[in-house]
Structures are given as structure tokens and as C-alpha cells.
Curated annotation (Swiss-Prot):
GO terms for cellular component: cell cortex; centriole; cytoplasm; cytosol; microtubule organizing center; procentriole replication complex. Residues 540-554, 589-602 have a biased composition (Low complexity). This is SCL-interrupting locus protein homolog. Pfam families: STIL_N (PF15253). Residues 395-432, 455-614, 778-803, 818-884, 954-988, 1210-1243 are annotated as: Disordered. Plays an essential role in early embryonic development. Plays an important role in the regulation of centriole duplication and directional cell motility. It comes from the Eukaryota.
Length: 1263
């Protein structure tokens, strides 16, 4: 069969139509039924024909007729009956009903036909309706026993609530209910006469006053969608009313969108449509127009040139839709309200049945003038809702986001947490650092403070503060002035507004690092600026600040210290001059600069801002609380913020301050964060916050700050507490100012501090548990000789006492003291001193211990700080003495980092007191230490030997702990020394070598003493940790090391110097920091960056800021940058660690030197507790150290190197204390050298870096 191919495409049209089925053509026409993408006209002009097609129609709730109110008599009688039964003068109830549109749609009628007695609400005074149904109108009623003609139905509060409810209804997406456009209240009263009941009824309703004008216009094409066809059909017209919105396509045809369609809230809208109504003036139309105008959900409302929008009405009486353009009436642009009232009286009879068919009728009118109207107008004029916000919504609906739409980014931003305004130089407005290691300290150059420190006190306070500085420098007795601190105490209640407290500043990097103080609240711009200076003063040695910024300090004296006006004001209220003193004093006496401050006593310590100041986010800026006190310049905010002397800065600081010379007082103890203060410090006018709980019993609040210096054990009252340092002395008079700083601590910073404290405590507890579990294993494990020794020693001391010093964010710098300390109060106290000397020194320095520990630490710092090296008169001392526990506490950590139980601290106090009872011993120790310091060369050799012995130990950290223990023991009474030599054979060769070295120094250590056992336990625990994770044990946290050492040099296998410094700055009390700084300064050379850091006299400021910057805390890029410019010696750090086995111990928490220093400082601390003489001695050496000027850091390091080594090796009993203080100071100053030594000795090679701040400043800014 032949097939013919036909080309249909070529067929004529008439043939094609006849040959192809119609069904096949539907596919080709399908495109006709497809809606093209809808796009709004590009031009929003002339969207429809605006020419009027009829008369204007006004739309309003009550435009044509006032609302009518129908009250069913039965409901009224029920209300009266309940009111009479309650026998109350005022009975609250509800009337429920409905609101309906009149049949002619010209008004509304309210019918109240139900009574609701309401139900009591728990926790609320008012009642709630029990049977409210959707669509009901709720009328709260007050039924009064007696009619009061002068009373009003609404109260001001009621009116405000009504305004808000109405506004919310207009702006929300809630279902449109006409009843919500009117809020009604009633006041009823009834008087009985025979069988007659006379009711007085007062009604008041609030509704929207916006009137709209609708003008008929020509029809606008509508896209024939299913919805449009349905609405146009007869069936659709008879259905319930519907409503929606109108949009347009590119052809300017209207597209109907239902109210529930989500597209309505994204597409441009040109109006609204409604169905199921008859007339345009229907109140429903008015209500829907208001919703369209004021809805905050409709993002794009397009109005015509005349500000009108379309209204399409599918009327019940018209087949085709009606078109109107509508706009608010003239003068009705804003969302406003009107009051409708009605008052009437009626008489009912008791025995007459209520009429069912005739309700009581009332008419609500806006024309009535009465007291209700007056009140309404008054409240309306004051209402924000009726003003700009609502008005703007009506005026420009398309651009207006209604009040409910106030979730704009800006407003959200306002509600979201963010930094407080920092009206300070851009350089200072660096982002707040919220490091994972919150204790990271910022180093700011003392110069960071404005040259113009605000002198809140005025010229007189300034001079006073200067004089205070002088006092601090000149006489410890002046410290007694710190008694004025009670004023400060008052200010403590006021948390400092400063946010920066968490990021303490070292004076040097003032510009680079957080200009915390300056960034403080603008209102305290001066204060805050001062605060930085204060901080710097504290951080930097007061001498440095005095020398370097004395010129500015004298003028800005009050300002730096008074950087917080609030605190100052508080202080000024009680002691106007004191605050200034405090301001000026703190910088001067802040740390190692005590000497300088003495040299420049007249100068306001404020200049200290230029000095290095170590600020602990938690600990007070000043090395010692007294320093905090002295810091008139000291950052007041930090005082209150960190010192814990905020509320009681003056008094509280004074005790600690006195005990803690800038050298001896651990900054952490005195400088507690607000959280710390609350934790460990009480707002005691006479005691430094830390000192309060930690203030030894011998401390007497009455003694004032100086009294705290007094060691009850010793029975010696050193008005010049360990804070004999000029800074402390000056501080005493200025202490009141400390309150100001406290008051400045911002709530968010305070919360952060509290949270950090809590986290630290949790971490400490965890670490304690870990250590305890590990300690058992270490005892069994033969790997760790130190651990074995510890178990040997531990048995003697119950494991009750366990102190964990943690360098938060520094790695785990931990020390676990043997329980022996707790078992024997005396021994434990001595041990605790040994142990805590490492700890307590550090603790005092870093305020690492928990509250209990802080208390004990405070006792130490207060007791020992004055003269005991163990309370690091110099940072080194603190570190060394606290090497075991305290060092792990992280020289900078402060109380929060390490935990001590009060029992431990108490026992320590007892033992310390007993030990202190032997002033001769401590004097001898000090003498020996001084002689050792003098013989720097010999000391250096000895240190090298010690280092070698340490290197011999299996684990540097264990060895270090062991060596530290002997040192600590040596610092402890000689009884312990004797025991130490008889220590179990388990002790490492390093221990033996160390003991030999100590004996060569003339120091006898009894390894068997309880203290020694405790020390051993501590060492062993550290050893265990080191074996498990050397980095964890050697975290480079040596803020105390002296703080600067670990900061400056590699103190541990893990480069935690930055964290250590940060922790030290944050958690060490001012006294601790001052001791560290003083120690550094005392060591005549500022060889150690740490010395410079703490001390940061005018001599060397460059090291401080960088000390905080350790590779562990830097990004790779930052590390490379620092190395590129020679700011970091990361590689050297490992070598230094190897060089200095003692430094290895510092990696454990403090260098061995630190341990020795700490041991010495512990002994000194005890001596201080026992006798003030030791404190005096310590202070003197510190002063000398400070006095010794060293122009070059290298020279300082060189000079301090031998001394530090001597401390490391020969922190023996009497020498230990003397040498320890000096060594600590020297070590701080020679931290770099020690760290270098560590590089050699420490196989774990701490990554600590020595940063040259001076060079760093010259480089481009990283932050």
C-alpha cells in the first residue's frame, strides 16, 4: 500500500482545521491559560484613574451613629447580688456580650447579656474572666457600695493599656474582630431604699479616632482569577464576608489576594478588597482599612500620588465590584484615639422580675465633658503611642513599619548586648577581647593613660593624692591611711561601669592592648582614662609611673586613679581627698615602682600610667592590694572590679595592701574581680577585699591597711605592711579612691568575671579530682620519683588539703598539695605556706585560690606580703615560693585559677603564724637571700647547678617541685629544713643536689617536716602532671614567675606565658602584682621582662605588653608577624627552658626559681606573719631593687640572671626569704634570662617568648 507523506505545516488553514481534531489544538492553546509571571508595574505612578465618580464617604466607627449599649437587666441584678454578698466596698467583676454592626451598617451595638464574677489569679491582684468566648466583648466592672460622683471609670494606667491594645490590634496579623476596636469599662453603684434599687452606671469606651475618606472611582481591571470569579458569582456574594489585599501586574490589572495568603506580605500592595458587606461606610470596611494602613507586616504598600489606596467592595446589593480610593481624613494622619462615655441612673425593684424583652439602653458619646474626658486628654497627650509612632504609621503606610514592626535591625541591636560606648581614641576602641582564657591580661603602656588624667577630686585631691604617693613611697605608716578605705568600701557596692576590667592593661602596651580604662564608660571618660593610668600604675611599677609619668601624674593624679568618677565620687563623699590620693597613689605604688614613687613621692602616682601595670582581669591592677590602694592612679575600676576592694577598696585594700607591699602583696589577693570580691573578699573598710577573708586573724580591721600588715603571730605591727613599698604606703591614704574603681565595673564585665570565676572553680574542682586520682597512681608509679616522694610525704599529710592552681586558658598549670597540710594545721599551714607559698604567693599574687584559698592567700599576702618574699615582694618571689601549688596557680592566675579550702588556708595561717613566730629565722633567711642576691655571680653558678640537678630529674616539673619543696621548706622554719634532708630515699637526685646546694648556701631543709611533705606532695603532684602531660604542668604561666618570667620567657613546654600573664593580671591581687613588680624592681636590674612588666618603672616598658603576647595565645599569622619583627623569641624559649631547669618548673606553674623564690617568699611571708621585721626587710630590699636603676633591659637581665639563678637554687631558709624577694624581683626583672636558662634546662622547652615592647610599639599595630 502506497503511502503519501503530507506536510501539514504547508497545508492551507481551512484544510488544516478540517483535518485536525479540536482536542489536538488544546495543547497549542494551553499557553493562553498559563499565567505569565506577575511583575508590578515599573512605574508606580498613575496606577489607576483617580478621578472621582461620586461623593466622598467618611468611614468611622461612630461617624453616623454613636455606639449603642444594651445591658440586660438580669446581668445587672446578678452583679449587684454578688457585690452585696462580698461585703466589700469595691467588687470587681465582668460583663460579657457582643458587638454587632447595625443593620443599616451606620453604627454598632454592644449587647451585654452575661455576668462573670471572674476568678482570682495567682500572683496577680486582678481577676480574670472565666467564660470569655471568641468574638466577645469584655467589660471590666467595678461595683461600689457608694456612688462617688467625682470618680473616673478609667485610671491613667487603664487608659494606657487601652491605647496599647488598640494599637496592637491595628498593627498585628490577628483575626480582624470589630470588638477589638473598642475597649469598654464600667463603674456601677447601687443604693437601696426600701424595695428600690437605684443604680448609677458610668460607661467609658476608648476607640480609634482615625476617620477615612472614601471616594468612588472608575472600575479598574481585575485579573479573572478563581477568587475573583467566585466573589462575583451570586453564590459568593451570599457567603460570609471575606477580605484580602490588592496587587497589580505589569498591565496594571488588579490581582486579588486573600488575607491568609503569605504573598500578601511580600508583594507590593495597592489596596484592599472586602465581600459580604453592603455599604462602604460599614465599620468592617473602616476596620480593615485601618489594618491595611497601620499593619507592620505589610512591607510594601504603594499609594497613589494623592496618598490614596484602593478599596474594592463586593457588595451584597451590587453584581459588580465597587471601586473606591481611600485616604485618612485631613488631620487624621496619626493613629489617634477618642473617648466615648455615658452616665445614667435607673431604678429597679427588688421583688419585680427582670424584664426579658427590654434591655437597659445607653449611648456612648464623645461629646460628654467630664472628669473622665479631662483624664483621657491628659493621658493621651503623654502617650507615646498616639504621637509620632502612630501618626507616622498612618501618614506613610507604605513606608511605615508599625509599632509592632519594631523588630528592625536597629532596635534589635539596641536590645542586644553590645559593648558600652567607648568615647575614646580609635586605638583604644579595640574590640573587647573575650578570650577562651578569660584571665588573659592586657598590657598597656603606663603612657596609655591620658596625659591629662582626670582629677576628680580637684586640685586639692590631686595634691592629696600626690602626698599619698609620697606617703606610700616615704612611709609604710601612711598605708594606715588606707583605713579611709571604708569609704571606698561604700563605693564597692557600685560595680564599676568599666567593661574592660576583664582585660587588664599592662602599662606598656597601653595603646596596643585594650585601653580598658580609657575605654571605660564615657561619662567617666576622665575616670576611665585615669583608670587606665591607674591600671598602668598598678601594673607598671609605681616608680616607673612616677618617673615616667610623674609629670602627668601629678596633674592627673586624681584622674588616673579617679578614672572612675563614680568611685571617686563615692570616695570623695566620704573622703574626697582620698580618692584622688588613690588615683595618684596606685600608679605610683602599683608595683615595683614603689621605689620610684618613693623617689618621686611628691609626684602624683598618676604618671604611672606610663609605667607598666599588670592588670588582672580579676585581680587588682596593683601588684598588691595596697598597691591597689595606693593607686590613686591604680585603676579604680579594677580595684572594685579586680581587687575586690571595690566596695571596701580602701579599708580592705589597706590591710592587704599593707601586708602586701607592691612586692609582697599578691596583686590577685587584693585585686579581686567583683566576683572575686564577692567570693573571697568582703567589703570591709579596714580590710582589703581579698584580705578580708584571707586576712589573717592577726590582721585587725581597726589597724587599717597597716594593721593587716601586722602579723598576729609575729605580734609585730608593721604600719608599713609588706606594702611598705612606697606605693602601698602612699596608697594607704588614698585607698578610699579604690571604691571608685570598683563602682565603675560594668554589670556585664562583672557577670563575665563571675562566670569566669565559676568556670575556673569548676575547672579547678575537676583538676583536683584528676590530680587526686592521678596522685594515687603517681604514688604507686615508680616513673615519677617526685611523685613517689610525694606519696611518701603525702602519707604524713592527709589528702584533705588539696590546692589546685589552674592557669585558666594557660594549659593546665596545676599543683596539688598533699593532704598532709590539712591533717596538721601547723605543719599543714607551714606546708601550706610552702605549698601555698608557691600557691599562696602566687595565689596572693594571682589570687588564684578560691575564696577560701583567697582568704588564706590573703592572709599570706597580708601577713607575708609586707616582708616575706613568699608573697612575692617581687613577682619572682611569688612564683618561686608558690612554685609548687602557687606557681601552678599560675603566677597570674589568682584565686579563681587555683582553689584552696578554707581549712587549708586556716591551717596554713596557723602554721604560718607559728612559723612567723620565729622572726630571727626569717631575718636570717632574708639576710641570706640578700647576701645571695649580692653575690649574683655565685648565685648564677648555683642556679646553674640547681638547673642541672633539675635536668637530672626524670621530669623537670617533678624535679622542680622537689627542689622547690626544699626551697619552700627552707623558707619555712628550719625544722622543716631538717626534715627535708631526711626526706625519703625516693627523692630524686635533683632533690639531693638541691639540698646540697641549699646547704652550701647555709640553708638546712628538713624534708620530713610536715611542710616539706606537703611541699613534696605538691612537687610530686606537679611531677605526676608533668609526667602525664608536661605541658599541662609546665604551662608557662609564670606571671609570678615572676609573672614576667613566664610571660617574657618560655617558662613551660607549653607557651602559656601569655595566659599566665593574662591570668596573673586578671587574678592576681594588686598586692601580688605589686610584689611581683617590686620583686622585679627590687632586683636592681629590670633584666626580666616580667620584672619590667610588673615593675615597669620608667626603665623598661617595652617588655610588659609583649610579655602577655605568647605564641600560644597568638594566631599563626600573629606569631609570624611577631617573630618577623623580633617581637617574639619563640625558638629561644625552648632553649631557655633547657638552660633553666628551674624555669622548667615555672612551666609547671612557676619556674624552679620561682619555686625557690616562692619558698623564700613563703618563709618571708610567714616571717611577716610572725614579725613585721621580715616585711620591713623585704620591703627594704624591694625598695633597693626598685631604686637600683637599670637603663637597659639587657643589663637588667644580666644582673638579675645570677640572682634569679640563686633564687632558683638557693631559695633557702633565711636566704630564701631575703634572696627570694630579691630573687623574685630579680627573677621578674631577669625573667628573660631565667627563661633562657629554662630553654637550656627544660627539655620540655616552654614556648614562652620574650617580647620587646619598645620595638613592638614601633611596629604596625596588630589590634
Amino acid at each position: 500500500m502506497n503511502r503519501v507523506q503530507v506536510d501539514f505545516k504547508g497545508l492551507p488553514a481551512h484544510i488544516l482545521e478540517n483535518s485536525i481534531a479540536a482536542e489536538s489544538l488544546q495543547n497549542t492553546r494551553s499557553s493562553d491559560n498559563v499565567l505569565t509571571p506577575l511583575t508590578f508595574p515599573k512605574s508606580k505612578v498613575a496606577l489607576w484613574d483617580p478621578s472621582a465618580n461620586g461623593e466622598v464617604v467618611s468611614l468611622h466607627f461612630s461617624y453616623y451613629r454613636n455606639p449603642r449599649l444594651f445591658l440586660v437587666e438580669k446581668a445587672l441584678r446578678l452583679a449587684h447580688r454578688h457585690a452585696r454578698q462580698t461585703n466589700k466596698p469595691r467588687f470587681f467583676c465582668f460583663l460579657l456580650g457582643t458587638l454587632a454592626v447595625d443593620s443599616d451598617e451606620e453604627g454598632v451595638t454592644i449587647t451585654l447579656d452575661r455576668f462573670d464574677p471572674g476568678r482570682e489569679q495567682t500572683g496577680c491582684l486582678g481577676k480574670a474572666p472565666t467564660a470569655l468566648l471568641p468574638g466577645d466583648i469584655l467589660v471590666p466592672c467595678v461595683f461600689e457600695a457608694q456612688h462617688a460622683a467625682s470618680s473616673t471609670v478609667h485610671s491613667s494606667e487603664d487608659l494606657n493599656i487601652s491605647f496599647k491594645m488598640l494599637q496592637h490590634f491595628c498593627c498585628s496579623k490577628e483575626l480582624l474582630e470589630l470588638s477589638k476596636l473598642l475597649t469598654l469599662r464600667a463603674q456601677l453603684s447601687c443604693s437601696e431604699n426600701m424595695d428600690r434599687l437605684t443604680f448609677n452606671l458610668s460607661w467609658a469606651a476608648v476607640t480609634l479616632a482615625c476617620t477615612l475618606d472614601a471616594v468612588p472611582i472608575r472600575a479598574v481591571p481585575i485579573i479573572p482569577t478563581a477568587l475573583a470569579r467566585n466573589l462575583s458569582s451570586p453564590a459568593g456574594v451570599t457567603q460570609n464576608s471575606k477580605r484580602g489585599f490588592l496587587t497589580m501586574d505589569q498591565t496594571r490589572k488588579l490581582l486579588l489576594i486573600l488575607e491568609s495568603d503569605p504573598k500578601a506580605y511580600t508583594l507590593p500592595l495597592v489596596g484592599i478588597w472586602l465581600s459580604g458587606v453592603t455599604h462602604i461606610h460599614n465599620p468592617l470596611v473602616w476596620a480593615w482599612c485601618l489594618r491595611y494602613l497601620h499593619s507592620s507586616s505589610l512591607q510594601d504598600k504603594v499609594l497613589s500620588e494623592g496618598g490614596t489606596f484602593l478599596v474594592v467592595l463586593y457588595s451584597l446589593t451590587h453584581r459588580d465590584p465597587e471601586f473606591y480610593q481611600c485616604k485618612p481624613s485631613t488631620g487624621q494622619q496619626q493613629l489617634s484615639f477618642q473617648l466615648l462615655t455615658s452616665r445614667d441612673s435607673l431604678t429597679l425593684y427588688k421583688n419585680v422580675e427582670p424584664s426579658e424583652g427590654r434591655p437597659l439602653q445607653f449611648e456612648l458619646s464623645s461629646e460628654n465633658q467630664n472628669q473622665e474626658t479631662v483624664l483621657f486628654e491628659e493621658v493621651l497627650s503623654q502617650s507615646v503611642l498616639t504621637g509620632t509612632t502612630l501618626g507616622a504609621a498612618s501618614a506613610a503606610p507604605q513606608n511605615k513599619l508599625s509599632i509592632s514592626d519594631h523588630d528592625s535591625g536597629v532596635e534589635d541591636e539596641d536590645l542586644s548586648p553590645r559593648p558600652s560606648p567607648n568615647p575614646h581614641p580609635v586605638s583604644q576602641q579595640t574590640k573587647r577581647v573575650h578570650p577562651l582564657v578569660p584571665e588573659l591580661s592586657m598590657v598597656l603602656d603606663g603612657s596609655f593613660l591620658d596625659g591629662s588624667v582626670v582629677n576628680t577630686q580637684g586640685s586639692t585631691p590631686l595634691s592629696h593624692s600626690q602626698s599619698n604617693v609620697h606617703r606610700r613611697n616615704s612611709s609604710p605608716a601612711l598605708q594606715g591611711l588606707s583605713v579611709l578605705r571604708p569609704l571606698v568600701q561604700g563605693s564597692v557596692t557600685k560595680p564599676p561601669p568599666i567593661r574592660r576590667p576583664l582585660t587588664p592593661i599592662l602599662s606598656q602596651p597601653k595603646n596596643k592592648l585594650h585601653p580598658n580604662p580609657s575605654q571605660q564608660t564615657p561619662q567617666h571618660s576622665v575616670s576611665r582614662k585615669s583608670l587606665p593610668s591607674m591600671r598602668r600604675s598598678r601594673e607598671g611599677s609605681s616608680a616607673s609611673s612616677v618617673s615616667s609619668s610623674s609629670s602627668s601624674s601629678s596633674t592627673k593624679n586624681a584622674s588616673p586613679n579617679g578614672s572612675f568618677h563614680q568611685q571617686r565620687q563615692r570616695l570623695s563623699q566620704g573622703f574626697p581627698n582620698k580618692p584622688q590620693l588613690i588615683y595618684s597613689g596606685p600608679p605610683t605604688s602599683g608595683h615595683s615602682s614603689a621605689k620610684k614613687s618613693s623617689s618621686v613621692p611628691s609626684q602624683t602616682p598618676v604618671p604611672h600610667p606610663s609605667q607598666h601595670r599588670i592588670f588582672h582581669s580579676t585581680p587588682a591592677v596593683n601588684p598588691c592590694n595596697c598597691c591597689t590602694n595606693h593607686p590613686s592612679v591604680a585603676p579604680l575600676y579594677q580595684n572594685n572590679t579586680w581587687q575586690g576592694t571595690p566596695g571596701y577598696p580602701t579599708a580592705v585594700h589597706s590591710p592587704c595592701v599593707f601586708h602586701c607591699s607592691p612586692e609582697t602583696v599578691p596583686p590577685g589577693d587584693h585585686c579581686l574581680s567583683p566576683s572575686r570580691q564577692s567570693l573571697g573578699c568582703r567589703v570591709s573598710p579596714t580590710k582589703s577585699p581579698v584580705c578580708y577573708h584571707s586576712t589573717p586573724p592577726h590582721y585587725s580591721p581597726s589597724s587599717g591597711p597597716c594593721v593587716p600588715t601586722i602579723i598576729s603571730n609575729k605580734g609585730l605591727v608593721e604600719q608599713t605592711p609588706s606594702c611598705q613599698a612606697q606605693c602601698c604606703q602612699v596608697k594607704g591614704s588614698k585607698e578610699p579612691c579604690l571604691d571608685t574603681p570598683m563602682g565603675l565595673l560594668p554589670a556585664d564585665a562583672y557577670r563575665m568575671l563571675i562566670d569566669q570565676e565559676r568556670q575556673l572553680k569548676l575547672l579547678q574542682l575537676q583538676i583536683q579530682k584528676l590530680l587526686e586520682s592521678q596522685s594515687k597512681v603517681p604514688e604507686v608509679s615508680s616513673e615519677q620519683n617526685a611523685q613517689q616522694q610525694r606519696p611518701n610525704q603525702v602519707p604524713a599529710s592527709p589528702p584533705k588539703r588539696t590546692s589546685v592552681s589552674i592557669a585558666v586558658g594557660t594549659g593546665a598549670s596545676l599543683f596539688w598539695s598533699t593532704p598532709q597540710e590539712t591533717s596538721t594545721h601547723e605543719a599543714s599551714s607551714l606546708e601550706w605556706q610552702t605549698e601555698t607559698e608557691p600557691k599562696s604567693g602566687c595565689q596572693n599574687d594571682s589570687t588564684v585560690t578560691s575564696r577560701d584559698r583567697s582568704e588564706s592567700a590573703c592572709h599570706y599576702s597580708e601577713e607575708h606580703c609586707p616582708g616575706s618574699p613568699q608573697h612575692p615582694t617581687s613577682p619572682q618571689h611569688n612564683t618561686s615560693s608558690g612554685f609548687g601549688v602557687q606557681m601552678f596557680q599560675s603566677p597570674v592566675l589568682g584565686e579563681s585559677a587555683s582553689m584552696y579550702y578554707q581549712s587549708q588556708s586556716q591551717s596554713k595561717d596557723l602554721s604560718e603564724n607559728r612559723e612567723i613566730d620565729d622572726p630571727r629565722f626569717y631575718h636570717e633567711l632574708l639576710g641570706q637571700v640578700q647576701s645571695r642576691l649580692q653575690d649574683s655571680v655565685i648565685v648564677e653558678d648555683k642556679v646553674e647547678q640547681d638547673q642541672q640537678s633539675l635536668l637530672k630529674t626524670q621530669s623537670l616539673s617533678p624535679v622542680v617541685h622537689q627542689s622547690r619543696k626544699p626551697l619552700t621548706t627552707s623558707s619555712i622554719p628550719q625544722t622543716q629544713k631538717t626534715k627535708q634532708p631526711s626526706s625519703p630515699p625516693n627523692q630524686d637526685r635533683v632533690l639531693s643536689a638541691t639540698l646540697k646546694q641549699l646547704q652550701q648556701f647555709g640553708v638546712n631543709i628538713d624534708l620530713d617536716s610536715s611542710q616539706e611533705k606537703t611541699t613534696r606532695a605538691t612537687v610530686e603532684s606537679a611531677s605526676t602532671l608533668a609526667c602525664i602531660n608536661p605541658e599541662a604542668v609546665i604551662p608557662r604561666l609564670a606571671l609570678s614567675e615572676p609573672v614576667g618570667a613566664s610571660i617574657w620567657g618560655p617558662s613551660g613546654s607549653v607557651d602559656l606565658s601569655l595566659e599566665a600573664n593574662a591570668i596573673a593580671l586578671k587574678y592576681l591581687s594588686d598586692s601580688q602584682l605589686s610584689r611581683l613588680s617590686l620583686g622585679s624592681q627590687s632586683s636592681s636590674p629590670h633584666s626580666d621582662p616580667s620584672t619590667i612588666l610588673l615593675r615597669r618603672p620608667a626603665v623598661e616598658k617595652s617588655n610588659v605588653a609583649l610579655s602577655i603576647l605568647s605564641p600560644s595565645n597568638m594566631s599563626l599569622a600573629t606569631c609570624k608577624y611577631m617573630k618577623k619583627y623580633g617581637l617574639i623569641e619563640g625558638e629561644i624559649s625552648s632553649e631557655e627552658e633547657q638552660e633553666d631547669p628551674i624555669q622548667v618548673d615555672s612551666a609547671l606553674g612557676c619556674s624552679v626559681q620561682h619555686e625557690t623564690s616562692k619558698t623564700i617568699s613563703l618563709g618571708q611571708e610567714r616571717e611577716e606573719q610572725n614579725t613585721a621585721v621580715l616585711k620591713n626587710i623585704t620591703n627594704k630590699p624591694v625598695v633597693n631593687l626598685h631604686t637600683s636603676p637599670i637603663d637597659s633591659q639587657e643589663q637588667i637581665l644580666q644582673d638579675l640572671r645570677p640572682k634569679m639563678q640563686l633564687l632558683l637554687r638557693g631559695g633557702t631558709n633565711s636566704e630564701k626569704e631575703n634572696a627570694t624577694k630579691r630573687n623574685l624581683i630579680e627573677r621578674r626583672s631577669s625573667l628573660t634570662e631565667n627563661q633562657r636558662t629554662q630553654e637550656v634546662v627544660d627539655p620540655q622547652g616552654s614556648v614562652g617568648n620574650f617580647l620587646d615592647l619598645s620595638r613592638l610599639r614601633q611596629l604596625p599595630k596588630l589590634f
